[in-house]
Regions:
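Extended, low-polarity segments enriched in aliphatic/aromatic residues
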Residues: 1-289
Length: 289
């Protein structure tokens, strides 16, 4: 059966909230809000004001995990300062899920490459999750969307290295590339299934650079904004975003497509689909004003 993906070309904070209401999926209990806090120096990440209506609606807690590379977010102290500087703690409760160990380990018995996922231990404190993704390019994954947020985004600092290294954290930058992409698909499955259906995905196709929000020095957006998508299927929503980029007549789309293709970005979606926790087949339902 095709997954439903709702789509609007209007990109406003209020429209994000409206799309959640259109989806008709009520998240229950204490809700983790997974988003990207933005590397210091990055100009493209989506700011707190943009997400405020949906987070306030859910009374959600913004959750993040420390990075596994040098920068402004690789230690708890630096990351909290960056979160404050970027305005997140001004509006929301913020939880660095891996600020204190030990990591929470999610088993992935059906994982193709990795059978364990190391996530921030505070994940156990939440009943559900909304994954707020800024869709854009990525220097390693080709693109960043819902699957990246589920995997790398929810992984602890060690867990990020473990995924990048395809199960060998010391190979963080040297592992076989497709094995890294398949590890992301494995890890994403464990988080998606952990919340037992009490999870929603929103992808925003705005400020689309070839670079991720994890880059302190990032290229400016290369193509015009496209819209907001929402679904309960992380695979379908990422596939829909990829398809919208390819369908665009924007003169800058080729630059983003080159980034996706040169990093074999579609393979993460292929690997996730093979694991069966979502579908690449979807019905795109456009919501008009």
């Amino acid at each position: 059966m095709k997954s439903k993906v709702y789509f609007t070309r209007i990109i406003t904070p209020e429209k994000v909230l409206e799309m959640y209401e259109v989806l008709g999926k009520e998240l229950i209990g204490k809700i983790a809000v997974k988003l990207h806090s933005g590397e210091e120096g990055n100009q493209n990440f989506l700011k707190p004001d943009f997400w405020r209506p949906i987070i306030d609606k859910l009374n959600g807690t913004v959750v993040e995990c420390n990075t596994a590379y040098e920068g402004s977010r690789n230690t708890t102290e630096k990351h909290l300062k960056t979160i404050e500087k970027h305005g997140w703690s001004k509006y929301f409760d913020v939880d660095l899920m891996d600020a204190e160990g030990p990591d929470m380990i999610l088993d992935i018995p059906e994982g193709k490459v990795i059978q364990k996922n190391y996530v921030g231990k505070d994940m156990e404190n939440y009943d559900g999750m909304i994954v707020l993704s800024h869709f854009k390019g990525h220097p390693m994954g080709g693109y960043g969307g819902a699957l990246k947020q589920l995997s790398i985004g929810c992984a602890s600092s060690y867990g990020k290295a473990y995924i990048h290294g395809a199960g060998e954290s010391e190979k963080i930058w040297t592992a076989d590339h497709d094995l890294f992409l398949e590890s992301m698909a494995d890890a994403a499955k464990s988080v998606h299934e952990y919340f037992k259906g009490n999870i929603v995905y929103i992808n925003v196709m705005k400020n689309m650079s070839v670079d991720c929000d994890c880059c302190a020095v990032a290229e400016d957006p290369c193509m015009d904004d496209i819209g907001i998508l929402i679904s309960t299927d992380p695979i379908a929503i990422d596939q829909a975003c990829i398809d919208l980029v390819y369908a665009s007549n924007d003169k800058g789309r080729d630059h983003l497509i080159e980034r996706i293709e040169s990093r074999h970005g579609i393979h993460t979606i292929e690997a996730a689909s093979a694991l069966g926790y979502g579908s690449r087949e979807y019905e795109l339902i456009e919501i008009d004003d």
